[in-house]
């Protein structure tokens, strides 16, 4: 699972997920990728399950880049616990996703096969996404 090696503070506040993503919005490594078109939150398990689905479909040909990293701790209190007594423990690591953010990139394989693999990965993600290529990259969200 993806998570930071160490952080300055164990727990963070929730914050707000607003606006569009300008950093990490363009293809930098591959020829085709998945771009988020709505706000959401992705955790390390979702990132990993989508990656596994893609790599199994392409039979380890080509290369896959993960463009997101879950660096925000999400806390939860145990079930049937009364209110109070402090904030719960860290349950999982997440990353807030804004529209326009690239999630995965691929290179070195046929575009039709890459589209099939990325469609499998899209079904594992908890927000709406679209497949972009280097030609369609300049389209707005």
From Swiss-Prot:
Keyword Metal-binding belongs to the record: no
Gene Ontology process terms (BP): translation
Keywords: Ribonucleoprotein, Ribosomal protein, RNA-binding, rRNA-binding, tRNA-binding
SUPFAM superfamilies, A to Z: Ribosomal protein L16p/L10e (SSF54686)
Stretches the record annotates as Disordered: 1-20
Entries under InterPro entries matching the protein: Ribosomal_uL16, Ribosomal_uL16_bact-type, Ribosomal_uL16_CS, Ribosomal_uL16_dom, Ribosomal_uL16_sf
GO MF, one example: tRNA binding
Family matches, as Gene3D superfamilies: Ribosomal protein L10e/L16 (3.90.1170.10)
A GO cellular component annotation in the UniProt record: cytosolic large ribosomal subunit
Highest taxon listed in the record's lineage: Bacteria
Keyword Ribosomal protein recorded: yes
Protein family membership: Belongs to the universal ribosomal protein uL16 family.
Chain's role: Binds 23S rRNA and is also seen to make contacts with the A and possibly P site tRNAs.
Quaternary structure and interacting proteins, as annotated: Part of the 50S ribosomal subunit.
PANTHER family in UniProt: 50S/60S RIBOSOMAL PROTEIN L16, LARGE RIBOSOMAL SUBUNIT PROTEIN UL16M
Name of the protein in question: Large ribosomal subunit protein uL16
